[in-house]
């Protein structure tokens, strides 16, 4: 269940969050491989995440204040999420993501280091905002905004 998302860098937490495309944005657009993306400031994301959006194709967790559960990651080399720093990102994605083939945790870690983090380090922040993982999660699609607990097992 993949959805088109835009990147939102939260410098206060050093977290790159992904939001459904169509959210109100005052950020300048960035050209990415899937079209124009936007990089809204944290305050540009409305409090009622998604109430004004077209909901077709979006999982329930797209409206969580933490962002989509499988598509939230940091720029830290240890690849820890800020929500649950005891689990590495590859392990979370391995459990929750449908968009990638089944891989071991080691393979996933190598995949993200090669495809994402290496480019972040070499190309800098401007390019980093355009590099993201477009996968999916196991949450059901919704017809109306609904809360989603980030910690709920999929």
UniProtKB/Swiss-Prot annotation:
One of its GO terms (biological process) is DNA-templated transcription. Coiled coil: none annotated. GO terms for cellular component: host cell mitochondrion; host cell nucleus. The keyword Transport does not apply. A fraction may be phosphorylated in insect cells and HepG2 cells, a human hepatoblastoma cell line. Phosphorylated in vitro by host protein kinase C or mitogen-activated protein kinase. N-acetylated in insect cells. It comes from the Viruses. Multifunctional protein that plays a role in silencing host antiviral defenses and promoting viral transcription. Does not seem to be essential for HBV infection. May be directly involved in development of cirrhosis and liver cancer (hepatocellular carcinoma). Most of cytosolic activities involve modulation of cytosolic calcium. The effect on apoptosis is controversial depending on the cell types in which the studies have been conducted. May induce apoptosis by localizing in mitochondria and causing loss of mitochondrial membrane potential. May form homodimer. May interact with host CEBPA, CFLAR, CREB1, DDB1, E4F1, HBXIP, HSPD1/HSP60, NFKBIA, POLR2E and SMAD4. Interacts with host SMC5-SMC6 complex and induces its degradation. Interacts with host TRPC4AP; leading to prevent ubiquitination of TRPC4AP. Interacts with host PLSCR1; this interaction promotes ubiquitination and degradation of HBx and impairs HBx-mediated cell proliferation. This is Protein X. The lineage of its organism: Viruses, Riboviria, Pararnavirae, Artverviricota, Revtraviricetes.
């Amino acid at each position: 269940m993949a959805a088109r998302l835009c990147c939102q860098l939260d410098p206060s937490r050093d977290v790159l969050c992904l939001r459904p495309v169509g959210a109100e944005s005052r950020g300048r657009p960035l050209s990415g491989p899937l079209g124009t993306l936007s990089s809204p400031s944290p305050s540009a994301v409305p409090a009622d995440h998604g109430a004004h959006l077209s909901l077709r194709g979006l999982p329930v967790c797209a409206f969580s204040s933490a962002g989509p559960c499988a598509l939230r990651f940091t720029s830290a080399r240890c690849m820890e999420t800020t929500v649950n720093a005891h689990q590495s990102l590859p392990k979370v994605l391995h459990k929750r993501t449908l968009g990638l083939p089944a891989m071991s945790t080691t393979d996933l870690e190598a995949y993200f280091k090669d495809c994402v983090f290496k480019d972040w380090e070499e190309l800098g922040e401007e390019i980093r905002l355009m590099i993201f993982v477009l996968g999916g999660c196991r949450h059901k699609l919704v017809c109306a905004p609904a809360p989603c607990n980030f910690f709920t097992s999929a």
